């Protein structure tokens, strides 16, 4: 719609997809968990098909694996029915498996029953990102790396101050992930949330045990908790991962247990929303911390549905950090959030399934820009 416009992408790292986009389970989500009518539900359903179509068009390897959500006790069987109803409302094709049918599909997985989700897939989202960058540059776009944003202001357009100079633009879109609240604050607005970093620790199983499952295996989630639980995921590179957990990190880019950033810690521990969140989930907070420090505890969560896993099967694998948006009252933001200014739009909250939803999110941003210009 704007063929004469110039577009630049400012990337603070030396290359793309080094953080949340490149450090995740690689799952093309179907949209099982999300509140009907929410942006997450809509964009995930659209993104599932759009991501696969993009991969096919540009010859990016992916697999349509499907996914099993396994109930290991009667409480989870009950929650399974609620999840099935949500799938129905979100128009997600599913099949209910009995204990025997689950055993037939996955001989090494135990459970009382399962939900079979047919449209889930596996891909390397970093490869999608690099393909998008190549297409962007080929279309005349400009990509600046090692370009840390240090200021953002508005007056007759937007001015972005960076480590390599200043950029002026008619409109700015901020997709800063773990630093989204800081971008909003640069505009002079006080965000309704703060980003709290939760490290997701993964393990991979040895090569000889990679065939222990054929599909992604997830537990039935507890709707009272903000995370999905530890799962098994056959990755696009052939590895099989166990995880992630969700433990508070001491740095927004803290990928190791003792990685610390003083600024991040001051902002986090000075935020009332952190303590209200912990008070809301005291048991899970302590359990996640314990399992991060004590591998046998981590293992037990996976052994509930995959008893063949042993402690020696948990081999090192890179961690990720999830940008969790939390309000001052301790409540987590459940849906995608976009914060508008006169000449700017900041993606404020974009946790999972944002990678799956990336193409619909991009279309939504373009539509918002058209309205604002």
Predicted regions, residues:
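Glycine-rich FAD pyrophosphate-binding loop
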Residues: 2-23
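Proline-centered flexible-loop/turn and helix-kink motifs
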Residues: 3, 56, 107, 307-310
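Dinucleotide-binding Rossmann-like beta1-alpha1 core, especially the glycine-rich loop
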Residues: 27-101, 111, 229-230, 239-241, ...
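Short beta-strand to alpha-helix junction loop
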Residues: 35-46, 70-80, 115-135, 144, ...
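A short coil-to-beta-strand element that immediately follows conserved catalytic motifs
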Residues: 62-65, 192-198, 309-318
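Flavin-dependent oxidoreductases
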Residues: 152-261
């Amino acid at each position: 719609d704007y063929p004469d416009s110039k577009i630049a992408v400012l990337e603070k790292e030396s290359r793309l997809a080094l953080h949340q986009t490149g450090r995740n389970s690689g799952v093309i989500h179907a949209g099982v968990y999300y509140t009907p009518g929410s942006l997450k539900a809509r964009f995930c359903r659209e993104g599932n098909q759009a991501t696969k179509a993009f991969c096919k068009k540009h010859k990016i390897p992916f697999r349509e694996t499907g996914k099993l959500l396994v109930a290991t006790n009667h409480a989870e069987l009950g929650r399974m029915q609620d999840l099935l109803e949500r799938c129905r409302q979100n128009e997600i094709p599913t099949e209910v498996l009995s204990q025997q049918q689950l055993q037939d599909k996955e001989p090494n997985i135990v459970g009382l029953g399962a939900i079979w989700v047919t449209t889930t897939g596996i891909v390397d989202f970093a490869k999608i990102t690099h393909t998008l960058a190549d297409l962007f540059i080929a279309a005349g776009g400009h990509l600046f790396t090692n370009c840390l944003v240090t200021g953002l202001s508005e007056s007759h357009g937007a001015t972005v101050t960076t480590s390599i100079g200043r950029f002026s633009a008619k409109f700015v879109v901020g997709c800063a992930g773990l630093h989204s609240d800081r971008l909003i604050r640069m505009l002079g607005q006080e965000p309704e949330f703060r980003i709290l970093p939760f490290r997701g620790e993964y393990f991979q199983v040895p090569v000889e045990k990679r065939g222990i499952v054929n599909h992604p295996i997830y537990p039935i989630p507890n709707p009272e908790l903000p995370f999905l639980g530890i799962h098994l995921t056959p990755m696009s590179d052939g590895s099989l991962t166990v995880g992630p957990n969700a433990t508070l990190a001491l740095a927004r880019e803290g990928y190791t247990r003792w990685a610390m950033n003083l600024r991040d810690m001051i902002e986090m521990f000075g935020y009332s929303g952190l303590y209200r969140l912990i008070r809301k989930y005291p048991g899970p907070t302590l359990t996640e911390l314990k399992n991060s420090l004590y591998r046998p505890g981590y293992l037990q969560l996976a052994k509930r549905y995959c008893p063949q896993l042993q402690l020696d099967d948990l081999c090192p694998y890179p961690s990720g950090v999830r940008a969790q948006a939390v309000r001052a009252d301790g409540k987590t933001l459940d849906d995608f959030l976009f914060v508008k200014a006169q000449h700017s739009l900041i993606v404020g909250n974009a946790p999972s399934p944002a990678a799956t939803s990336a193409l619909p999110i991009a279309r939504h941003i373009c539509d918002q820009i058209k309205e604002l210009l």
